[in-house]
Structures are given as structure tokens and as C-alpha cells.
């Protein structure tokens, strides 16, 4: 789960991470009022969307007067901002962050992530902070410095100092930098984050260290432990189908293809998408119905798949372990009848009560194509949608 920058900064502020003073605004009038409450000659008006690259796309403006704040707020609110992370459709700006400007001396990058290779938390830093960090990582990866944290002891002060010196943080500001990194790490662990990124982290001419931007991503599986984070969720920034899926306890991610997939188990779902691609098909979604699917849940899954107008066929791939194939078959039949399915439907069943499940599909009288294996099913659905 993602949150907006202004929400991320308030969360970090509560842990003692220094951030600029700022106020969220949902209207032009609120933006002007916010600017009046803030200090300093420069105000920064920042578009709030769940995507990076806002600066390059024109979503961050420096205002030197109240008139410019009003002008920029009017320009940004309601605008569709297209960045390298939004895709060509972009995202509509519905809120702004108005913030006090600061005299930047140097920009850095600081990020904390879970590393799949080491299975540990890794803290990354670079002296090349700012808008082009992705290009830096690709062109000169040696400029990204990493510190792996031992989970048994947590982040050690010497690791943060080592990072500071490698990044070229001024000696007089190293202690402040170490304090920020330590607090950010504590937040990361306490709140079950998967990403905590500050880009840029800046040193100022006044001798401060500030988180000028903040990106936080939280592990959705741990949200039940963090009601304060859940309260910050902005569903308007998410795919409506993914929001609907979460309400029905379905794991759904929309893709760009035309073959809808209904599978039980995340690993099998990924393998299903791979084998569809192998047979020159294009999956329209990742959809894991989990191990406890009911007829009602399968029906909701079908509705979800069919809400994508690009879908030209559906491949159901079930391996019944905890889940029983006859229950899934009943759900498929009920769902097909309820939604009036007219698209090609290929079903592959294996596992518990598989014979009973296949008989239910056969006796339904519906135009369901049976598959003997995952490869057979993928090949059949790829051919049917062409």
C-alpha cells in the first residue's frame, strides 16, 4: 500500500525525521491559505499522486508570491500528470502539498528496501540524489552505496556513519545524518514497510539535514497491525478493479493482455502467466483466489475479470489441494450462468475431487473447453482468442 508524500512526511515527522513544514490542500483556496501560514519567501507547490517523476513532469513548482501559489495551484489541480511511473494514461491531481522552501546546499539519495538476494533489509545511499536517480542506478551503479542490516542486531551507528562518509556528507552534519537514518530504519521496521525512500535528502546552507521528499510503501499483509496507516489509504489512486478485489479477499493485479486468468495460489498464477506468454498469448491479469474459494468468491472473480473490456477469453487453472475441484467447478458453472459468459473459457482442473469437478463441468451443458494440463490449457486459450 502506498501513501501520498504529505502523509509520508507526517508519519516520518512523528518518528523525529526532519521534514520541511507543509500543509496539504485540496482546493486553490486551501493552497493559498496554506502558503499564508508558512514561513519563508519561497513556497513549493507539489502535486500529490502515487507515482515518482513528478518534478520532471512539471508537477513541482517554486512560487515566489501568493499570486504564483494561486496560479500554480489552479494549473495543477485537476490536471492529468504523466510520468515515467504512471504510464501513458497518467494520474489526475486531486490534492497538493504546499511547503516551505529551503536553501539547498547538496542533494542526496537515501532508501531502505527488503533485498530478496540477502533476505535482509538494505540501506542504500548516493551522492547523486534528485530527479535522475534511476538513470544513476542504471548508468553508474557503483555510485549507489549499500549497507546490509543484520536483523539480529538491527542498524548499527557505524553503518550509518560509513554510509555518510561514502556519500560525502559534510563532516559537521554526519551526526545529523546518522540520526535521520536511524530514525528512518526504526520507522521502516515498526511499520512493516517494504520501501522507505527519501529522494532527495538535502543538506541546507543553514546546516540542516532534511527529507525533502518521501516515498513509503507498506506490506499489505501486515496492514492489520497498523490501523493508522490503513486510514491513509487513497483508493482513488488505485485501479478500481484492484480495490474491488481487495474487498472480496482476492489478489488481483491488472495487466495489458486479453486472456483473463483465474488461478489458486500465487506461484501457480505466475507460472500460468508465463506459460500463456510461451504460447504467444497475453495475460490480462494476475488473479489468485486463494485456498478457500467459495462459489460466491469464484463468481466475484469472474465479474472482476470481465470488467476489463480487453479480455477476450478466460483460462481457469486450478490445482486442488486445500481447495476442492468440485467446489470450484460449481463456482465456475454458477458464475458462467450468472454473468452470461459469451467468451471462450478453458478450464484445467487437477487435485482433490478432480473427477467430480470435471463431471460437473461436463454436465453443465456450457461451452467450456477442458484442458488436460496447464500447457494444454494455455495453448488452447491462446488459440481461441486469436
From Swiss-Prot:
UniProt binding sites for Mg(2+): 199, 213
Free-text cofactor note: Binds 1 Mg(2+) ion per subunit.
Main EC class the enzyme belongs to: ligase
Positions that bind ATP: 46, 53-55, 99, 102, 107
EC nos: 6.2.1.5
Domain called ATP-grasp: residue spans: 9-244
Pathway annotation: Carbohydrate metabolism; tricarboxylic acid cycle; succinate from succinyl-CoA (ligase route): step 1/1
Record-linked InterPro entries: ATP-grasp (IPR011761), ATP-grasp_succ-CoA_synth-type (IPR013650), ATP_grasp_subdomain_1 (IPR013815), SUCC_ACL_C (IPR005811), Succ_CoA_ligase-like_bsu (IPR005809), Succinyl-CoA_synth-like (IPR016102)
Pfam family, one: ATP-grasp_2
One of the record's GO cellular component terms: cytosol
GO biological process assignments: succinyl-CoA metabolic process; tricarboxylic acid cycle
Cofactors (names): Mg(2+)
Disulfide bridges in this chain: none
Any one GO molecular-function label of the UniProt entry: succinate-CoA ligase (GDP-forming) activity
Binding site for substrate: 264, 321-323
Quaternary state and interactors: Heterotetramer of two alpha and two beta subunits.
Function: Succinyl-CoA synthetase functions in the citric acid cycle (TCA), coupling the hydrolysis of succinyl-CoA to the synthesis of either ATP or GTP and thus represents the only step of substrate-level phosphorylation in the TCA. The beta subunit provides nucleotide specificity of the enzyme and binds the substrate succinate, while the binding sites for coenzyme A and phosphate are found in the alpha subunit.
Similarity remark: Belongs to the succinate/malate CoA ligase beta subunit family.
Family annotation (NCBIfam families): PRK00696.1, sucCoAbeta
Record's protein name: Succinate--CoA ligase [ADP-forming] subunit beta
Organism: Exiguobacterium sibiricum (strain DSM 17290 / CCUG 55495 / CIP 109462 / JCM 13490 / 255-15)
Name of the coding gene: sucC
Amino acid at each position: 500500500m502506498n501513501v501520498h508524500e504529505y502523509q509520508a512526511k507526517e508519519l516520518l515527522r512523528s518518528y523525529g525525521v526532519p521534514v520541511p513544514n507543509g500543509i496539504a490542500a485540496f482546493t486553490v483556496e486551501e493552497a493559498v491559505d496554506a502558503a499564508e501560514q508558512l514561513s519563508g519567501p519561497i513556497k513549493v507547490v507539489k502535486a500529490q499522486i502515487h507515482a515518482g517523476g513528478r518534478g520532471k513532469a512539471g508537477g513541482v513548482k517554486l512560487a515566489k508570491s501568493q499570486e504564483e501559489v494561486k496560479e500554480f495551484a489552479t494549473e495543477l489541480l485537476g490536471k492529468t500528470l504523466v510520468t515515467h511511473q504512471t504510464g501513458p494514461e497518467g494520474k489526475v491531481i486531486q490534492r497538493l502539498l504546499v511547503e516551505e522552501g529551503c536553501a539547498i546546499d547538496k542533494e542526496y539519495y537515501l532508501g531502505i528496501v527488503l533485498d530478496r538476494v540477502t533476505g535482509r533489509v538494505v540501506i542504500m545511499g548516493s551522492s547523486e540524489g534528485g530527479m535522475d536517480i534511476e538513470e544513476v542506478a542504471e548508468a553508474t551503479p557503483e555510485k549507489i552505496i549499500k549497507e546490509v542490516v543484520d536483523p539480529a542486531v538491527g542498524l548499527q551507528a557505524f553503518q550509518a556513519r560509513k554510509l555518510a562518509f561514502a556519500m560525502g556528507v559534510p563532516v559537521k552534519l554526519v551526526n545529523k545524518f546518522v540520526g535521520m537514518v536511524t530514525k528512518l530504519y526504526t520507522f521502516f521496521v515498526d511499520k512493516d514497510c517494504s520501501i522507505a525512500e527519501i529522494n532527495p535528502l538535502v543538506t541546507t546552507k543553514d546546516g540542516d539535514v532534511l527529507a525533502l521528499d518521501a516515498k513509503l510503501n507498506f506490506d499489505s499483509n501486515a496492514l492489520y497491525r497498523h490501523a493508522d496507516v490503513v486510514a491513509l489509504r487513497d483508493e482513488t489512486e488505485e485501479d478500481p478493479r484492484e480495490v474491488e478485489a481487495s474487498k472480496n479477499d482476492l489478489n488481483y493485479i491488472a495487466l495489458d493482455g486479453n486472456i483473463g486468468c483465474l488461478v489458486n495460489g500465487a506461484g501457480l498464477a505466475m507460472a500460468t502467466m508465463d506459460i500463456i506468454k510461451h504460447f504467444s498469448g497475453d495475460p490480462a491479469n494476475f488473479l489468485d483466489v486463494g485456498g478457500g474459494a467459495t462459489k460466491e468468491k469464484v463468481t466475484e472473480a469472474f465479474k472482476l475479470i470481465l470488467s476489463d473490456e480487453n479480455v477476450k477469453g478466460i483460462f481457469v487453472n486450478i490445482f486442488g489441494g486445500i481447495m476442492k475441484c468440485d467446489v470450484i467447478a460449481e463456482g465456475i458453472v454458477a458464475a458462467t450462468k450468472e454473468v452470461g459468459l459469451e467468451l471462450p473459457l478453458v478450464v484445467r482442473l487437477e487435485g482433490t475431487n478432480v473427477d467430480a469437478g470435471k463431471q460437473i463441468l461436463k454436465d453443465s451443458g456450457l461451452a467450456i473447453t477442458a484442458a488436460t494440463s496447464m500447457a494444454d490449457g494455455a495453448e488452447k486459450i491462446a488459440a481461441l482468442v486469436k
